């Protein structure tokens, strides 16, 4: 596929290779560790920002999922009062709560969207360089198509996030804060009520506020979760322990693979999100690692979920 200089602006070439995908030491859905091969591709240096998304909306008039009323057919048991445009917003609690119930810190806020990240009355002023949030999978895919790009597969994303450090726990090595230096925007303290802000941020941070990985990519860890195009499976599908048979450019394109979970909208397929966010903490969500993965319903928009794009084609000087 041929590419243009404008299309590749602020993108980094990720050389292809084979790596060990997954992890055996953390959550069950990350297993098994297995070899995967990916071809080289271009990836956005940072998550799509509010400013970049604003230019897309200005050019197309696009309206995000969070800006549209919910379809009652998708939520047959939902309160009709909640079928209005809006999105999920995180609220820090006043003290310790039951971590088994996410409703203690998440609330569906009518009027919350990418322009109004905390709901009506918030305008996101001064956040042009922050990752855009409150974008559902459909919104991310629409932006990618407009930009002449695509969303990454889960394998591409994890390979890129590792930055050439195959097998390391984090994108920068095996120590979370080497020499006491914070390497990503995550939660420090007791979630969801005590945020010590050792990293300097309570919410999202401007892209590039923390060091890049070995491929020159920033914010592959923390800040915001990122959509990938793969449907979620409870464990790695098509995995093999044989290096001779490493899947080549694998992708999960079947919605049937994504599983069904209880709750409103549970019949909707789920896509893999990667990277963790500023809300991930050792006491609750130890998912600020390349191998970590989670399934998210395709209509979900939240205050900690964004995306970045890829281009599959020729590398620098035809590499």
Role assignments for model-derived ranges:
Residues 5-13:
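GGW-centered surface loops in extracellular recognition modules
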Residues 13-14, 20, 25, 69-290, ...:
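Functional-site microenvironments in short loops/helix caps that host divalent-cation chemistry
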Residues 28-31:
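C-terminal, low-complexity/hydrophilic appendages and adjacent surface loops
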Residues 35-41:
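A short N-terminal beta-strand-loop micro-motif at the entrance of redox/enzyme domains
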Residues 41, 56-65, 147, 315:
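Short capping motifs at secondary-structure boundaries
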Residues 44:
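An anion-binding catalytic pocket shared by soluble metabolic enzymes
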Residues 49:
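Acidic-aromatic/histidine active-site loop/patch
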Residues 303-317:
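Short, structured beta-strand segments at or near domain termini in extracellular proteins/domains
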């Amino acid at each position: 596929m041929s590419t243009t200089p404008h299309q590749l602006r602020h993108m980094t070439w990720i050389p292809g290779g084979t790596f060990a995908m997954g992890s055996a030491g953390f959550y069950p859905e990350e297993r098994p560790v297995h070899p995967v091969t990916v071809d080289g591709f271009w990836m956005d240096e940072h998550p799509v920002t509010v400013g970049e998304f604003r230019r897309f909306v200005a050019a197309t008039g696009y309206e995000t999922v969070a800006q549209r009323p919910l379809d009652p057919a998708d939520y047959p048991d939902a309160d009709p009062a909640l079928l209005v445009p809006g999105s999920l917003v995180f609220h820090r609690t006043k003290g310790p709560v039951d971590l088994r119930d996410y409703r203690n810190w998440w609330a569906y806020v009518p009027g919350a969207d990418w322009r109004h990240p905390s709901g009506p009355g918030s305008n996101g002023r001064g956040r042009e360089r922050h990752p855009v949030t409150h974008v559902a999978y459909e919104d991310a895919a629409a932006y990618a198509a407009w930009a002449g790009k695509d969303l990454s597969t889960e394998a591409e994303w994890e390979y890129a996030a590792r930055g050439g450090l195959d097998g390391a726990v984090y994108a920068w090595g095996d120590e979370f804060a080497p020499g006491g230096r914070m390497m990503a925007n995550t939660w420090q303290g007791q979630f969801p009520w005590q945020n010590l802000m050792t990293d300097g941020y309570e919410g999202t941070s401007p892209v590039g506020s923390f060091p890049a990985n070995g491929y020159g990519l920033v914010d592959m860890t923390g800040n915001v979760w990122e959509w990938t195009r793969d449907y979620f499976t409870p464990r790695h599908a098509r995995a093999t322990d044989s290096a001779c048979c490493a899947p080549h450019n694998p992708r999960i394109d079947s919605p049937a693979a994504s599983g069904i979970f209880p709750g409103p909208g549970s019949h909707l397929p789920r896509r893999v999100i990667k990277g963790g966010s500023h809300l991930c903490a050792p006491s609750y969500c130890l998912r600020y690692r390349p191998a970590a993965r989670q399934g998210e319903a395709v209509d979900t928009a939240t205050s900690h979920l964004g995306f970045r794009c890829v281009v599959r084609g020729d590398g620098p000087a035809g590499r």
